[in-house]
């Protein structure tokens, strides 16, 4: 666990991290305490000048996270993140590339997060296709994962790898090539800290292809998971139960899970919301005892039916706290992944999610509404805090009635 300890020793501030990430968290905590926003780069938030800083020497602080793996998913990036990156800081690759990912990874550490699902729309170059990206994951000690199976980025990588489109992305008809596709990524990633998504869906966020009827789909997924576990064993060496894995029962996959799909006990069940920030299903008492634990994939942005919301972030801290506190109380403590869309519209709400992931008791549902004022005060100063908080609270109230896109 990436924890840190701070204390004074002979008039020196000592920060000890349980891991390199823990040390980074401790250093960035000092930065936070003296008024530096985690978004100092992303939002140009300049800290207020301080002529003097004081540090009390009468206490030792130890901090550790409530949730083990916590991070963000860049998604639906075509209209903002992608064109911005390729026209500004990543002109060399003309895509979301290492300069963008370096800033995202620093932001994750500043927010005490540790996990990244990189952008994966069809026009976004796959994270693992650039050596510079991979070096960043090591440099910043970020745990890499993906919403696509086995660390792949299907929309960018599958056609380039296979020469086929969605028609070839069926384990029922093309198991040998798909197995090779997954195995090559597992081998490539063996020296990196990573969490593997197991199971399978079709391309373009659709159901599994090539299996007619629920019974056939269950049998097919069972074969798929067995093949993936063998890849993990062969490519990473040793016991697959020691390699972090998640299964995400998203959309139709939840129906299949509830119909009896068996997931190995060491795999984290990453439950889902309904795309609008309300959790669909909580783990049972038996599921909470799984050795792999439980997690949540949560949306602050969504592109799809019946209603998209990517222009403005509309999920209030009160709703987030109610749902994620409920998740935590029901055993979802291993993995929290937040879909932030292009990030910019959801910066404040994502910061709130990571505040909860670090200390789930910091913003309980009954006081979460005060986060807007706390955020406004630390970002813009006390003179503007009340007015800005009122504006944000009214925004959340109106957005709860109707999304801006509608």
Please name every model-derived segment:
Residues 1-64:
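Contiguous, structured surface segment used for ligand recognition
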Residues 49-50, 372-406:
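C-terminal non-catalytic alpha-helical accessory regions
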Residues 19, 72, 112, 269, ...:
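Conserved, mostly hydrophobic/aromatic
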Residues 37-93, 99-119, 292-295:
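An acidic-aromatic substrate-binding cleft motif
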